Amino acid sequence: MNTVSVVQFLAVGCAVFVLYGRGVFAAEGVKKAGQHKDAELCLGSDGLGHRLDEFWYNDDMCQRFLCFKDDEGIMYEQIANCPIAIAEGDCTLKPGTKGHYPDCCPAVECPPEDQKEEEI
């Protein structure tokens, strides 16, 4: 698989979309976390308390979560989702493996550039 580099950032509301080469778009969102009965824990969108700065996962939805505090002490939950993968031309869509984000995400796989030149 070719290495892709970030070429553009586009911020919309609280979500950040990153455009990668070869039709891969990633999305990441941040929302204010709920207050847990234990003030040292963040109330995640799963309804459970989580320690600050530790990741937890939803493997069924292929998501990664993280709670953090801003400079004012407000807790936020960061949610990382799989990129939107679009296979164009000679590229194919390869399903992700089972397990935690990002390994469970689909990927766009393209033939190496030198292989394309040989076919011409």
Curated annotation (Swiss-Prot):
UniProt keyword terms in alphabetical order: Disulfide bond, Secreted, Signal, Toxin
Segment forming the signal sequence: 1-26
Localization of this protein: Secreted
Pfam families given in the database record: SVWC
PTM field: Contains 4 disulfide bonds.
InterPro entries: SVWC_dom
GO cellular component, one term: extracellular region
Superkingdom of the source species: Eukaryota
GO molecular function: toxin activity
Predominant place of localization: secreted
Disulphide bond pairs: none
Tissue spec: Expressed by the venom gland.
Protein family (similarity comment): Belongs to the scoloptoxin-16 family.
Protein name: U-scoloptoxin(16)-Er2a
Source species of the chain: Ethmostigmus rubripes (Giant centipede)
